[in-house]
Amino acid sequence: MPVYRIADLDILINPIYENTIKRLFPYITNSENYDFEISLTEDEKNSLDENGFSTQTTPVSEDSIILQKLCCTILESYNGFFFHSSSVMVDGNAYVFSAPSGTGKSTHTALWRKYFSDKAVMINDDKPIIRKHNGSFYIYGTPWMGKSNIGNNIKAPVKAIYFLEQSKENSATKVSTGSVFREILEATVVPQNKATMHTLLSTLDEFFSATQVFRLKCNMDIEAVKTAYNAVND
């Protein structure tokens, strides 16, 4: 069975379907050792059709089941959490933009790539993982990159988190974690188990206590990039 390196963890996965194999391939490693294993139960396998998609009314796939199990294991045992966002790296630091789907996260990070050109490298356009590794938090690219399928198998320390809103005028205001706590929870996977929920809250508190957080109101002009970047770098 192949081993994949995701978020600085070696994970044993045996994907069955071609679309999942292709998605995971850039993360394959030669390691014979692994930190944990992800596998589908027989019931989960039996619920999928010949293309790896659910035969039930719930829209799931082999791909999404693996992602869910990955996020749960990293949360429970490896000091990390899934964070629905679009993240771009400039000069070795990550700038992370979170908002409900359709708000314009991908559009905004596309402007960063236009403005900074080769200095801007996409980490992940939809489903990165934030994890504490060797005493520091990093945001990691994952094989799951949303509709755009833009991202890289890289990591970077987080310079700032921005909660994005559409606006005619551009502004970036530093805010407290408490003021955006609802949005933080909406951007991650909230467990039903009380013990795991405690782990999530503790990890979020540790990460956000050490991270600058902004409310970014912006339009689709290149000036929006300057507003966001200057808020944390001036």
Which residue stretches match the model-derived regions?
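Conserved lysine of the Walker
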Residues: 105
